[in-house]
């Protein structure tokens, strides 16, 4: 079954499903360990170990007050700006758990787990608890599949209409990944409450489901589905979807080793070794899945890193999902400093886009570097700038300064562009941090 992530906007992505089972783990040193033990993993040399986060804007001469004002203004515009031209966050009444709000893809008139989880992450990082809780309440109320007989039980419908009606009843793992991480950070920053606001319990439950959900078949509003877990145990990678019929490949932009390292420390104990190994696998996968000259990754890839063609024309090229991949490896370098190849990858992709022209590069390319679509998208401007966290070449400063001068996205495409703009600004200013439990 095929379902498109976008219809009217230029951003499209095919979704459906997958499965597998859990195995025993081996420590990197070669010694066998019980799955109930916390793995002995290095803390690396990044912000997790040092507690220090670079502010690249200040490094380039912008005052701390300027940086804070710029980020605060972006949050205000995207969350509380003009509802027709600026905002993507909308309040939606109350229920027994309190206020409700959704974050919408304005061009497609829906709410997605991707955007809802991004909104929660941005809110916990910037200490906006009311918005965080309202988004989580809406996600649990309308997106969460609580029927134990439903094939997607325990997951979230990846897309709903803004009235809460599902557009599909299957999951997109990038949403679950960001939900889990945002909930752990909320627990660390604000403390857990009761019910759906017991952030740690909710994160633990969802992370367990992602790895261990048994295969289930059944009916949905959109036809029969067979759904399993969201990871491939053999390859130790996140799947594109948890459906059995479409679960044999991955999406490079779903790979979040910076998060997996934290789950290897804070997640359910029996799964910590798996996430420690998954982090290392993803670091190697970034190299395998990117072109050795351009640094471009495909939207979808096989587990060996080769591009994965599907009926979606963007599957095997650098397209909308792919924008995020460089940001993922660069944040991993910033937080952990364990994989020097990530620095090479950042230099490589920035060299490619610099050659295209910082003020005019397109937003879709073949992996070899032939332009497919010429729209100059703020979201890609943002993630290319975030690559500067790992870059070594002086050109990285030009990418940072270009983002600094770029206005907050508005208009029809403000959802995806806006979320990537907001998070990249936070990464580059040192305001996207690890909130560790006390």
Predicted regions and their residues:
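N-terminal secretory signal peptides that target proteins for export/translocation
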Residues: 1-16
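Sec/Tat signal peptide C-region and signal peptidase I cleavage site
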Residues: 32-36
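Aromatic-rich carbohydrate-recognition surfaces in CAZymes
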Residues: 109-119, 164-191
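Lumenal/extracellular "mature" regions of secretory-pathway glycan-modifying transferases
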Residues: 82-86, 90-92, 130-175, 185
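Bacterial N-terminal signal peptides
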Residues: 18-30
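Extended ligand-binding clefts on enzyme/binding-domain cores
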Residues: 37-77, 84-87, 109-113, 148-155, ...
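Alpha-helical support elements that line or immediately flank enzyme active sites
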Residues: 120-129, 139
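C-terminal functional modules
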Residues: 362-438
């Amino acid at each position: 079954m095929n379902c498109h992530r976008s219809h009217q906007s230029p951003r499209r992505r095919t979704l459906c499903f997958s499965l597998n089972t859990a195995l025993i783990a081996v420590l990197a040193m070669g010694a066998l360990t019980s799955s109930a033990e916390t793995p002995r993993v290095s803390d690396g040399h990044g912000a997790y170990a040092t507690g220090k986060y670079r502010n690249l804007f200040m490094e380039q001469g912008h005052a701390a007050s300027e940086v804070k004002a710029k980020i605060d203004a972006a949050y205000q515009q995207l969350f509380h700006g003009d509802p027709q031209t600026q905002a993507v966050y909308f309040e939606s009444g109350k229920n027994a758990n309190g206020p409700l709000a959704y974050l919408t893809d304005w061009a497609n008139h829906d709410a997605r787990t991707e955007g809802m989880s991004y909104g929660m992450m941005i809110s916990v990082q910037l200490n906006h608890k009311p918005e965080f809780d309202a988004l989580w309440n809406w996600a649990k109320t309308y997106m969460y599949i609580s029927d134990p007989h439903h094939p997607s039980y325990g997951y979230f419908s990846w897309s709903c209409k803004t009235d809460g009606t599902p557009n599909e009843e299957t999951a997109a793992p990038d949403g679950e990944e960001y939900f889990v991480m945002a909930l752990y950070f909320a627990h660390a920053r604000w403390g857990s409450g009761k019910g759906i606001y017991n952030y740690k319990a909710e994160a633990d439950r969802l992370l367990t489901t992602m790895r261990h959900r048994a295969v289930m078949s059944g009916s949905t509003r959109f036809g029969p589905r067979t759904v399993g877990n969201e990871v491939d145990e053999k390859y130790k990678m996140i799947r594109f979807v948890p459906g059995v019929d479409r679960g044999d490949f991955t999406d490079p932009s779903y790979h979040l080793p910076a998060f997996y390292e934290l789950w290897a420390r804070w997640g359910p104990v029996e799964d910590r070794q798996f996430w420690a190994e998954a982090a290392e696998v993803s670091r190697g996968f970034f190299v395998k899945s990117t072109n050795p000259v351009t640094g471009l990754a495909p939207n979808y890839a096989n587990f060996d890193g080769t591009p994965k063609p599907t009926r979606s024309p963007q599957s095997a090229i650098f397209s909308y999902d792919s924008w995020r991949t460089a940001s993922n490896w660069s944040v991993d370098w910033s937080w952990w400093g364990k994989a020097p190849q990530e620095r090479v990858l950042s230099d490589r992709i920035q060299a490619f886009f610099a050659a295209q022209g910082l003020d005019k590069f397109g937003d879709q390319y073949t992996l070899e570097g032939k332009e497919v679509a010429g729209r100059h998208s703020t979201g890609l401007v943002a993630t290319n700038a975030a690559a500067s966290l790992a870059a070594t070449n002086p050109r990285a400063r030009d990418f940072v300064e270009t983002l600094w001068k770029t206005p907050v996205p508005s208009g029809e495409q403000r959802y995806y562009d806006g979320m990537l703009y907001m998070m990249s600004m936070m990464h580059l200013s040192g305001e996207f941090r690890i909130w560790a439990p006390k």
